[in-house]
UniProtKB/Swiss-Prot annotation:
Cellular component per GO, a single term: axonemal microtubule
Taxonomic source organism: Rattus norvegicus (Rat)
InterPro entries in the record: MNS1, TPH_dom
Disulfide links within the chain: none
TM region(s), chain numbering: none
Predominant localisation class: nucleus
Signal peptide annotation: none
Descriptive protein name: Meiosis-specific nuclear structural protein 1
Amino acid sequence: MANKKRAMSFSEKHQQLVDENFRKSLHVQVLNKLERQAKNQVVQNENDERVERQRFLRVLQNEQFELDMEEAVQKAEENKRMRDRQLEQEERLANELARLKHESLKDEKMRQQVRENSIELRELEQKLKAAYMNKERAAQIVEKDVIKYEQMKRDAEIERIMMEEHKRLLKEENVKQEKRDKERAQYYVDLEKQLEDQERRKQEAYEQLLKEKLMIDEIVRKIYEEDQLERQQKLEKRNAIQKYIKEFQRAQDLWRQKKREEMEEENRKILEFAKIQEQREGERMARVQESEEKRVQRQNLLIQKLEETLRQRDDLERVRQELYLEEYAEFIKLKMKEEVEQRLRKQRDRKQDFKDQMALREVLLQAAKEEEEAFKKAMLAKFAEDDRIELMNAQKQRMKQLEHKRAVEKLIEERRNQFLADKQRELEELQLQQRRQGCINEIIEEERLRLLKEHASKLLGYLPKGVFKKEDDVDMLGEEFRKAYQKKSEVCEEKGSS
């Protein structure tokens, strides 16, 4: 009975050990699954945050583009209003300059009006504003490139971390697998030891049974010797004892056979369980490998789609900026062409007015000369008619004619002087107007050079064509600026030729 109890206790311990190993395996699988789900959730959250940030940048870029277009339309309308105001202010400037008597006040007023209303200075300011706009756009492009590089860098870092984490998990899984293999091998060793112990205990039990049998034989012999007389009476008792011994031996054999069958069945179940566990572990590793390959494929596909989207968006943004710059440059060019044509037309009109004035002067001089001759003849005739009666002799007639001639010449001289004074006044007014225009041109040139000195060095590489009217403008800004500007121009020419 004690052997049977010990065998049952060993079976229960073995079953508990198997159950505990199975629970540990399930617990490890659950922990691995939870860890993978947490990592997948972190990656998904980072991807959602990156997509949301890209969407926000896209909205900001669209709003900036709409603001730029609206600003361009407003600038066009403002330029039109400025041209209208400029024409009105030029008329007011001419009237104001005619009224002003103090030269310093007049010069200051002229400078102020010229700075406010000069088309050339307005064009230069618009070009400088366009250069600042180009510089700002270039800075935005550089900033977007930096953001894109940082994003790619972060993606690469995430990929590296995920690969390292994957390698770490594989390494941990290999360590756990090795540990499980060692535990399984140790379990087999312990099982062999237990089988050996069971066999040893069986042998000891058999030897004990033999000893008990010898003891029983000895007891029977003694009983036979001591109670020879009562043999017949005790024969039945002895037969009963022998029967009991036989039954005990038969029961012992049956118990041994049953325990051997139970041990064989238990060993078979252990081997089957180990085989099933090994098969499950192989299937789990295959599923993990397949899931990892699918995850890497999805991640690579997502990265490719993201790169393609970023590239298409950058191409679209670059095309939009190029179109906007081309349209704005065409608008500035057309406006400059209109202003140049308007200035040339005004210059031609002024030249034509001057020619007309000179021709009119010649006509007036000729008419005045003819008028003088007619007036002279009329006055001589009138004086002659008035004094004809009073003349007494030829001497008085000659003296009277000379007197009339001197009076007529005096009147003619007075008319000529008046005419010359009027023409001189007109010439002085024309010269004054020319001096005013020259002063305005000087003020415009000074303001143009001032704007270039103030802004050109800050906008090197972003200045549009037409900002510098001559090479002296570049030299005026210094040797360092001239070299940098020349180098920038050579780089632009090389890009254009390539």
